[in-house]
Amino acid sequence: MRTQWPSPAKLNLFLYITGQRADGYHTLQTLFQFLDYGDTISIELRDDGDIRLLTPVEGVEHEDNLIVRAARLLMKTAADSGRLSTGSGANISIDKRLPMGGGLGGGSSNAATVLVALNHLWQCGLSMDELAEMGLTLGADVPVFVRGHAAFAEGVGEIFTPVDPPEKWYLVAHPGVSIPTPVIFKDPELPRNTPKRSIETLLKCEFSNDCEVIARKRFREVDVVLSWLLEYAPSRLTGTGACVFAEFDTESEARQVLEQAPEWLNGFVARGVNLSPLHRAML
């Protein structure tokens, strides 16, 4: 029997770089919110202990794919603690809608969905805290997708506080380029000393993204798309890019702007949600 599981996108509603540690990692403050839009992961259980990804990603080796790594990590962790039945395996496929290198968290979301789904299907019984701890070894953003609630994150992105920002509508646009995160974080002109503020203060301020100035300067495509969106609504970069988003109070407003978009603009309309569609599907 095949089951389907949502793997939603996320937006960074704001992102501030507050410093850089001696080990090179940047400290930050950011606000994560999910979208009711994303990839769909299909899982069919096997009884031979094998993990097979039926929809490989071009340019990514099977064992390097975050989906496979997440499945194998859960398999080992559960087996080592005696919580995995002998022969547990899975065929996994993905209907991919989220772009790679877009700042929407696609790979991290995929890994989190696999952890949560296989924990349920294999009846491992691991807690969300245990799954989130495992997820952190796969990527800094994986835990927020595992926990499934909009969150304020700080530290190097590993300290989470659940929050409930307004659930607005967004027009999300992809400029057609992929921006590797290190390109932004290694840029010498990246702001690295934004003052730390409390959650309460940040939620009252106008939101912005410290990475945006670098993305716009280094990638003309980002600047062009963002300039167009800013003519219609408050707009900014998500994560380290490349995707940008415009914020609206209603779905109809967002769709009206999308209908006016030039042919070269690749975008979609989605609602921001504080409870992940993955966790909503499990209720």
From Swiss-Prot:
Source taxonomy: Bacteria, Pseudomonadati, Pseudomonadota, Gammaproteobacteria, Enterobacterales
Catalysed reactions, as listed in the record: 4-CDP-2-C-methyl-D-erythritol + ATP = 4-CDP-2-C-methyl-D-erythritol 2-phosphate + ADP + H(+)
Enzyme class: transferase
Pfam families per the UniProt record, alphabetical: GHMP_kinases_C (PF08544), GHMP_kinases_N (PF00288)
Coiled-coil intervals, chain numbering: none
Any one GO MF annotation of this record: ATP binding
Active site residues of this protein: K10, D141
Name under which the protein is recorded: 4-diphosphocytidyl-2-C-methyl-D-erythritol kinase
Disulfide-bond pairs as recorded: none
Pathway: Isoprenoid biosynthesis; isopentenyl diphosphate biosynthesis via DXP pathway; isopentenyl diphosphate from 1-deoxy-D-xylulose 5-phosphate: step 3/6
Enzyme nomenclature, EC number: 2.7.1.148
Nucleotide-binding found in the keyword field: yes
Biological process, per Gene Ontology: isopentenyl diphosphate biosynthetic process, methylerythritol 4-phosphate pathway; terpenoid biosynthetic process
Residues that, per the record, bind ATP: P99, M100, G101, G102, G103, L104, G105, G106, G107, S108, S109
Assembly with partners or alone: Homodimer.
Biological role stated in the UniProt entry: Catalyzes the phosphorylation of the position 2 hydroxy group of 4-diphosphocytidyl-2C-methyl-D-erythritol.
Species this protein is from: Escherichia coli O127:H6 (strain E2348/69 / EPEC)
Family that this chain belongs to: Belongs to the GHMP kinase family. IspE subfamily.
Keywords: ATP-binding, Isoprene biosynthesis, Kinase, Nucleotide-binding, Transferase
